[in-house]
């Protein structure tokens, strides 16, 4: 087919009219050094703090140091193929991770990539890892209980939805066990859980996944793993990634719980990155902004009001509040809670659960020290029946600890003192609880009622746990209607007190233990 000259000129005119002459500007830099996961780039003039930088080999870096003529970035992945003279490009994006319901039941790395061998995560939703925490005007006071199922916590150091409660203690003392039990206890409550493992062995994380699967808790849990073999950069960003996944549920009027295990290792990773970036070291060689590292993370855990949820969802969800409860874990060295990072996190959080090595070694597990443990806002959220019955437990323990030290020097004690010591020993024994044996509100109330009203006083210390087991078994079989009523309402009145009395006296009469 031949075209006439007029047709050719017409075609050329059409092409010229359709020609798009827009220019795409790309900020390009040159890598001048690469070492220990840190790259220094010259020429990236348009980069912003926290921006993702495209590096060779489909790897990204995170811009942390913005100098006059260079940029210091930390590599998010393998950097062995990167060499001096390679090109780096601005992306104009900040780091985002996948979020949504599809992540439940999955194990992902700090960037949200699945590492459990179950295929891709079926979600298109993403969220930036760094977000500004909700302002004061959008927050609601904590007034709903988050039951851990652990007697000593729910009765003495209660946790509310939207609270930040620190778990602090030495290594190998049961910190993770408390967090895992709390996650297991959320089964059937609608609370979504995120467990962030920072700097742990891969075998330890695999063991936690197995425990959660065995107890049917993986269905409502996301695990974010930055293992000990991962780079310091991934260990540093893992808590922020997990927090964004939890905020997805909070902002849509749901309740979520996040465990950071543990923030000491995140602080170590951040210290390593900061020193490699040649930032000036301060106390214990930590950088000057290590407080901000944890405060900007933990302030994102909050209870938000109905207006916030409605505004965020563009009116799709109305009349619902959302919450993100945080359980950060801090590992101390030889019980030193006055070190830099522990004091920082204690001052940021709404209370702490302090675990002691001596208590753990003496067989009291969970090894919670009620003297140093406190919940600053949880009391308002505590279930009414546990609040009423748990007050006597704390008092009995406080009196017991005071008298115990005194009684070592006194040869003969009066009857009242002996009775207080007697009750304190039995209450201490009652608060022992095995891992994976969380209790419902009703069964916990039953145990506390028995201790509060002196039903344990004439038992041998060794009989307390068998008596409690028999009491719970009797209540669940013979008095299941009472148990269901207490679990549903959580109220405490004269009628409930009478019903509890009947159950305890029935058990005492049977002597089934």
Swiss-Prot record:
EC no. given is 7.1.2.2
Q: Which reaction does it catalyse?
A: ATP + H2O + 4 H(+)(in) = ADP + phosphate + 5 H(+)(out)
Sorted keywords for this record are: ATP synthesis, ATP-binding, Cell inner membrane, Cell membrane, CF(1), Hydrogen ion transport, Ion transport, Membrane, Nucleotide-binding, Translocase, Transport
Could you tell me which Pfam families the record lists for this protein?
ATP-synt_ab, ATP-synt_ab_C, ATP-synt_ab_N
Q: Which residues of this UniProt protein bind ATP?
A: 169-176
Show the GO MF annotations. ADP binding; ATP binding; proton-transporting ATP synthase activity, rotational mechanism
Q: Where is this site: Required for activity?
A: 373
Q: Which Gene3D superfamilies match?
A: 2.40.30.20, ATP synthase alpha/beta chain, C-terminal domain, P-loop containing nucleotide triphosphate hydrolases
Domain of life, per lineage: Bacteria
Gene Ontology cellular-component terms for this entry are: plasma membrane; proton-transporting ATP synthase complex
> Where does this one sit in the cell?
Cell inner membrane
Q: How does it sit in the membrane?
A: Peripheral membrane protein
Job description of the protein? Produces ATP from ADP in the presence of a proton gradient across the membrane. The alpha chain is a regulatory subunit.
Tell me the subunit arrangement.
F-type ATPases have 2 components, CF(1) - the catalytic core - and CF(0) - the membrane proton channel. CF(1) has five subunits: alpha(3), beta(3), gamma(1), delta(1), epsilon(1). CF(0) has three main subunits: a(1), b(2) and c(9-12). The alpha and beta chains form an alternating ring which encloses part of the gamma chain. CF(1) is attached to CF(0) by a central stalk formed by the gamma and epsilon chains, while a peripheral stalk is formed by the delta and b chains.
Give the HAMAP family listed for this entry.
ATP_synth_alpha_bact
By sequence similarity, the record places it as follows: Belongs to the ATPase alpha/beta chains family.
* NCBIfam families with a match to the protein in the record: atpA (TIGR00962), PRK13343.1 (NF009884)
Protein's name according to its UniProt entry: ATP synthase subunit alpha
> Which organism's genome codes for this protein?
Francisella tularensis subsp. mediasiatica (strain FSC147)
Which gene is this protein's source?
A: atpA
